[in-house]
């Protein structure tokens, strides 16, 4: 009896959180004309996650970022929310999944600017060196993942 109760609770715990069940639900704010944003959305969908998009003009998108706590130094072309976190720019899905597994107290992750070779910004095999940063609740950041240049 105890083992079946434990098994039922374990299954419930795994299905209660989207981060643990494997299928996440992203809301992405972007401009209508941004091709790299659309490519990043496809990167997320290819990993099996659900994505809803909202097209905004640049001014509304900038205000949306500010409202979510994204400062100019962390900004990129699109802003997503997933399971209580903000994902700014071309952040790889593996970094997002690690964030949701570890659940640090933070606003979210950012790939500041538009790093060449990041998801949605592919340029053949080339990738510029760049960092994905954890944006903390106080607005500061620290390196979450570093990506070396690749030719």
Task: Please describe what each predicted stretch is.
Residues 66-151:
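Thiol/selenol-based redox catalytic cores and closely related redox-interacting motifs
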Residues 21-47:
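Local sequence-structure signature of Cys/Sec-based thiol-disulfide redox active-site neighborhoods
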Residues 1-7:
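Bacterial N-terminal signal peptides that target proteins for export
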Residues 41-60:
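Conserved helix-turn-beta segment immediately C-terminal to the redox Cys motif
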Residues 60-66:
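Structural motif
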Residues 40, 60, 92-96:
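Amphipathic alpha-helical interface surfaces
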Residues 29-31, 50, 82-87:
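Second-shell loop/turn segments in exported
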Residues 16-18:
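N-terminal signal peptide c-region/cleavage motif recognized by signal peptidases
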